[in-house]
């Protein structure tokens, strides 16, 4: 379980083995009261690979949702999130840029279950996003852009608490491609310079 978290907005409690989003009711400006929202960011960086978590809703009423943020921009607060319950669907992939943009939605929100431990895994390869829930591929879509490396986290909305365990990031290292002859002095250049620089920058080469 990733240990270091902060709240951009919303309330959460971090315990030894789990993170708890504190649901409730919140007053929104110029609108009716609604379900509490939280944007939680951790210290893990991601630009491809897999992010997994175990998500449990303690109660479910629309618009209960918990999504893994696979991209977060700290300047604009824009993000891309994939998971459970977004925009009234059971499974969701969407982005927020001052408004919601839905990339792929499937399933009915009413089928989400209370106190069920959902094992959620999001995989990103280039612009392709795949969502697995309990080892079943439930959603796959291509974003209209490639996401840069960023810190990741959770987006939650609910009138009740949501528990998240085993939040794990398995980042795929970016790849550097080198075109050169396999002969001296290029072999020495590769070993002494190129490979060392790529190792320092955490790149596969």
PLM regions with names:
Residues 141-162:
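Flexible glycan-contacting loops in extracellular carbohydrate-active proteins
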């Amino acid at each position: 379980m990733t240990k270091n978290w902060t709240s951009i907005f919303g309330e959460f409690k971090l315990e030894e083995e789990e993170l708890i989003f504190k649901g409730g009711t919140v007053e929104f400006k110029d609108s009716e009261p609604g379900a509490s929202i939280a944007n939680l960011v951790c210290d893990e960086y991601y630009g491809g690979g897999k992010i997994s978590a175990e998500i449990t809703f303690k109660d479910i009423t629309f618009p209960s949702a918990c999504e893994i943020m696979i991209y977060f921009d700290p300047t604009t607060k824009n993000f891309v999130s994939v998971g459970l319950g977004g925009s009234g669907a059971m499974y969701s992939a969407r982005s927020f840029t001052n408004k919601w943009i839905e990339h792929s939605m499937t399933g009915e929100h009413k089928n989400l279950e209370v106190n069920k431990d959902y094992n959620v895994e999001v995989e990103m390869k280039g612009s392709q996003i795949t969502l697995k829930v309990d080892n079943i591929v439930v959603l796959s879509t291509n974003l209209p852009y490639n996401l840069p490396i960023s810190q990741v986290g959770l987006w939650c909305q609910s009138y009740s608490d949501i528990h998240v365990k085993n939040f794990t990031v398995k980042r795929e290292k970016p790849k550097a491609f080198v075109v050169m002859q396999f002969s001296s002095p290029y072999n020495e250049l590769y070993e002494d310079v190129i490979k060392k620089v790529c190792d320092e920058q955490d790149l596969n080469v």
